[in-house]
Design a protein with these regions (language model features):
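SF2 helicase catalytic motif II
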Residues: 1-34, 38-41
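Alpha-helical scaffold elements adjacent to nucleotide-binding pockets in ATP/GTP-utilizing enzyme cores
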Residues: 4, 17, 21-28, 48, ...
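Interdomain helical connector at the RecA1-RecA2 junction of SF1/SF2 helicase-like NTPases
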Residues: 44-149
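Long, largely alpha-helical accessory region at the distal end of helicase-like NTP-driven motors
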Residues: 122-124, 128-135, 139, 258-408
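Conserved RecA-like ASCE P-loop NTPase motor core of nucleic-acid helicases/translocases
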Residues: 150-157
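Conserved helicase motor "Helicase C" RecA-like lobe of SF1/SF2 P-loop NTPases
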Residues: 157-181
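Conserved RecA-like P-loop NTPase helicase motor core
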Residues: 176-285
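Positively charged, phosphate-engaging catalytic surfaces used for nucleic-acid and nucleotide handling
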Residues: 378-453
Length: 453
């Protein structure tokens, strides 16, 4: 009589031969216990010994005999509540055609524009990363008032970015952070050393995922272009392990729709689907999401077109803006300038809060932020900051508004619609309306409004 225990069984689908070998070795075992903290994959390779049943849409999904998810563990005090501090901002870059582009991270833009704005935000040379790392370090200082050995982790896309982020943190804190690179033979020892110390920061290239245990990590910066649900869940899993009741975790991330959707769905239980759902955000057969595919294609196109045009993608400038706090499926707070009193209200949240206290405290901070905004609007508060108004109009609505205004102006002047659009494009810069960002369309809306009046 044999009991076989398979831990992290989702890896059994990593290759056909791997899965076949597992089946051949253990198919006739009397009992099998399959365990995993992430019971899904970024592809459709079946996981050995897992039962799949069709859902309402006919998609075959995995079925567990027993599930203990994040939501239940949170209520039991086994894991920490995670607050996501989302940052938007203004981005400018040169595309592979030599066209200078600008867009707001968090605006309703096309997916390729969002991917390029996201890429610009993650540039170590830009202000966005400097401002977000500074905010994250302030948050870590606040958490360490209650949890003296709390540590922070920056998750980078590649080695070059990781080195850049490490240099930024050294400049901000005066202390060089632990740098973990996948090709470094001493990486595992360095992670263990960091785990046992009270150092503030560690920077790693994606490799800090499952199997890496650093319980004191309490603040994270998600500075990678990866947006697969599996990687996101494993990355956030580095911050949720509770050592004592009341510890919280804070993760800073860019306001990218795919990431904010994953943050909102943190407490939802996911299963592995053997069939692809027909939606735009589904992961592709190679495990990449549409956002990641666009990012990769943009980088490949940049390299190919450089020889033909002499241009390549170049981040020009970036500036961060506090957007909101995401917690327990809800949004808290309002857009605010970096360094403002409103942002500090959230960076200064206590490091020790029970799950049922977090939402109440966030609501109190949002109400206080509203009072600060009102006081600034009345002129009763002059703190050197302006009140940031969020963008409510969608890209489709902006295009519709621009076309309506162009129609009005064309009737007034007798010009053709196309002629007016061409003049606006020459005056404001940027590509045709179909490829223009929300910010570029807004500039044209503002100009045609001035002409109408």
């Amino acid at each position: 009589r044999t009991l076989v225990i398979l831990d992290e069984v989702h890896h059994g689908g990593d290759a056909l031969s791997w899965g076949d070998a597992l089946r051949e070795a253990y198919e006739h075992a009397e009992r099998r216990l399959s365990l995993t903290g992430t019971p899904f994959r970024s592809d459709t390779a079946p996981i050995p010994f897992v039962r799949y049943e069709p859902d309402a849409a006919g998609v075959r999904v995995s079925k567990a005999d027993y599930t203990y998810g994040y939501g239940r563990a949170l209520r039991d005090g086994v894991v920490r509540p995670v607050l996501f501090l989302s940052y938007a901002g203004s981005m400018r870059w040169q595309d592979q055609h030599g066209e200078e582009m600008s867009a707001g991270l968090g605006e309703d833009n096309t997916k390729d524009i969002t991917a390029q704005a996201w890429r610009t935000a993650l540039d170590p040379e830009g202000e966005w990363m400097q401002q977000v790392l500074r905010a994250a370090d302030q948050r870590l200082t606040e958490v360490r008032r209650d949890v003296p050995d709390a540590g922070g982790l920056v998750i980078a896309t590649d080695h070059e970015a990781a080195r850049g982020y490490a240099a930024l943190l050294e400049h901000l804190t005066g202390v060089r952070p632990a740098l973990i690179l996948s090709d470094d033979k001493g990486a595992s020892d360095r992670i263990s050393s960091f785990s046992e110390s009270d150092e503030r920061w560690m920077v790693a290239v994606r490799m800090v995922s499952e199997g890496v245990d650093v319980p004191r990590l309490a603040v994270g910066v998600y500075a990678t272009s990866s947006s697969t649900p599996l990687f996101f869940a494993q990355a956030i899993g580095r911050f949720v392990r509770a050592r004592r009741r009341g510890e919280t975790a804070t993760v800073f991330l860019p306001t990218v729709p795919k990431l904010t959707a994953l943050a909102h769905a943190l407490e939802l239980e996911r299963d592995h689907a053997l069939d692809r759902r027909a939606d735009a955000d589904a992961e592709q057969g190679d495990g990449m999401t549409e956002d990641e595919r666009l990012m990769a294609e943009a980088e490949a196109e940049d390299r190919a077109s450089e020889e033909l045009t002499g241009y390549k993608f170049r981040a020009i400038s970036s500036e961060a803006q506090f957007d909101k706090v995401l917690y327990d499926g809800g949004d808290f707070g309002y857009a605010a300038e970096v360094g403002s009193l409103e942002e500090l209200e959230y960076l200064g949240l206590p490091g020790i809060l029970d799950h049922d206290e977090v939402a109440a405290v966030l609501e109190q901070r949002a109400a206080k932020q509203s009072r600060i905004r009102d006081a600034r609007g009345r002129g009763a508060l002059d703190d050197g900051h302006r009140t940031v108004e969020p963008v409510h109009r969608s890209l489709k609505e902006q295009r519709t508004l621009l076309n309506s205004l162009v129609g009005l102006y064309a009737r007034q002047t007798g010009q053709a619609h196309g002629q007016v659009h061409s003049e606006l494009r020459r005056s404001c810069g940027g590509p045709a309306v179909a490829q223009a960002t929300a910010h570029q369309i807004q500039q044209r809306i503002d100009m045609v409004r001035r002409r109408l009046h």
